[in-house]
From Swiss-Prot:
Keywords, sorted A to Z: Disulfide bond, Endonuclease, Hydrolase, Lyase, Nuclease, Secreted, Signal
Gene: Rnase1
UniProt record, GO biological process: defense response to Gram-positive bacterium; response to bacterium
Family under the similarity heading: Belongs to the pancreatic ribonuclease family.
Native source organism of the sequence: Rattus norvegicus (Rat)
Cited Pfam families: RnaseA
Subunit and partners: Monomer.
Reactions the enzyme catalyzes: an [RNA] containing cytidine + H2O = an [RNA]-3'-cytidine-3'-phosphate + a 5'-hydroxy-ribonucleotide-3'-[RNA]; an [RNA] containing uridine + H2O = an [RNA]-3'-uridine-3'-phosphate + a 5'-hydroxy-ribonucleotide-3'-[RNA]
GO CC, any one term: cytosol
Sites where the protein binds substrate: 35, 38, 69-73, 94, 113
Domain of life: Eukaryota
Annotated protein name in UniProt: Ribonuclease pancreatic beta-type
Active-site residues, as the UniProt record annotates them: 40, 147
Ranges of compositional bias, category Basic and acidic residues: 27-45
Signal peptide: 1-25
Amino acid sequence: MGLEKSLFLFSLLVLVLGWVQPSLGGESRESSADKFKRQHMDTEGPSKSSPTYCNQMMKRQGMTKGSCKPVNTFVHEPLEDVQAICSQGQVTCKNGRNNCHKSSSTLRITDCRLKGSSKYPNCDYTTTDSQKHIIIACDGNPYVPVHFDASV
């Protein structure tokens, strides 16, 4: 009887661990392309210039968890238009790699910069709207944006 009980408990343990174990790993790792979309794409953009846009978006998009991301740019154009930049003029990235591309036209963007007096967890940003060319790094198959390099 003791062996049957042990076998039953062991089987139950294996079953429970089979359910619990996948959740122990946490969320699946975010791809570089998905991270680019989360951190830089806001196709709607602010309905009108708002000084609190960056504070709201940086928090909503998870860039103030654990620390305040010092600088970020949001692009207010359709994702397809930004992805198309990957087939436009190739330029050298800031890090020296050759997988960056410059947009052939200017795009609507918002630059967010952490204010000097701001300290985590109270991340406070300046919001600057503009129209500029952007430089993005592209990678993968399909060849898609994975890093925002600069705006010019």
